[in-house]
């Protein structure tokens, strides 16, 4: 299953400048997702991170992975009055810098679901090189 930006906007509660998933290229809802974040020089965070040497903040790479994970939980089905909230981040590692012009590939695989908590193994890559990874837990709750 694929998502265009219109589908993503309907699925996630985020909006500009904090919507960090541009396209979903593969999604098996409740199992796995592969999505894209196109990193452009026009991103507002590049104004201060860092002038003259723009680098995507690691925390926003993790947020991109968390947003992709939320789409994986929800799929294209609109779940009225429900939202996926980030619960925890474990073992986050940042391996390479992400800069303007990069296409960030976001992959998340559900490892387990227990008592409504979804645990994902997440990897972000650029040109098939791992740039970040983390284990992310999230929960589906009422808005």
Curated annotation (Swiss-Prot):
Annotated active site: 49
A Pfam family: FabA
SUPFAM superfamilies in alphabetical order: Thioesterase/thiol ester dehydrase-isomerase
Domain of life where this protein originates: Bacteria
Catalysed reaction, written as an equation: a (3R)-hydroxyacyl-[ACP] = a (2E)-enoyl-[ACP] + H2O
GO cellular component term of the entry, any: cytoplasm
One GO BP: lipid A biosynthetic process
Enzyme Commission code: 4.2.1.59
UniProt keywords, alphabetically: Cytoplasm, Lipid A biosynthesis, Lipid biosynthesis, Lipid metabolism, Lyase
InterPro entries in the record: FabA_FabZ (IPR013114), FabZ (IPR010084), HotDog_dom_sf (IPR029069)
Annotated CDD domains: FabZ
Known role: Involved in unsaturated fatty acids biosynthesis. Catalyzes the dehydration of short chain beta-hydroxyacyl-ACPs and long chain saturated and unsaturated beta-hydroxyacyl-ACPs.
Name listed for the protein in its UniProt record: 3-hydroxyacyl-[acyl-carrier-protein] dehydratase FabZ
The encoding gene: fabZ
């Amino acid at each position: 299953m694929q998502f265009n930006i219109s589908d993503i906007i309907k699925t996630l509660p985020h909006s500009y400048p904090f919507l960090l998933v541009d396209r979903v290229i593969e999604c098996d809802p409740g199992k796995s997702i592969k999505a894209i974040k196109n990193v452009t020089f026009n991103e507002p965070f590049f104004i201060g991170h860092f002038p003259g040497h723009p680098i995507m903040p690691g925390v926003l790479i993790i947020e991109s992975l968390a947003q992709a994970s939320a789409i994986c939980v929800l799929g294209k089905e609109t779940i009225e009055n429900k939202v996926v909230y980030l619960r925890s981040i474990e073992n986050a590692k940042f391996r390479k810098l992400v800069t303007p012009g990069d296409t960030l590939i976001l992959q998340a695989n559900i490892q387990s679901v227990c008592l409504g908590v979804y645990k994902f193994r997440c990897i972000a890559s650029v040109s098939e090189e791992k740039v970040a990874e983390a284990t992310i837990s999230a929960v589906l709750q009422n808005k």
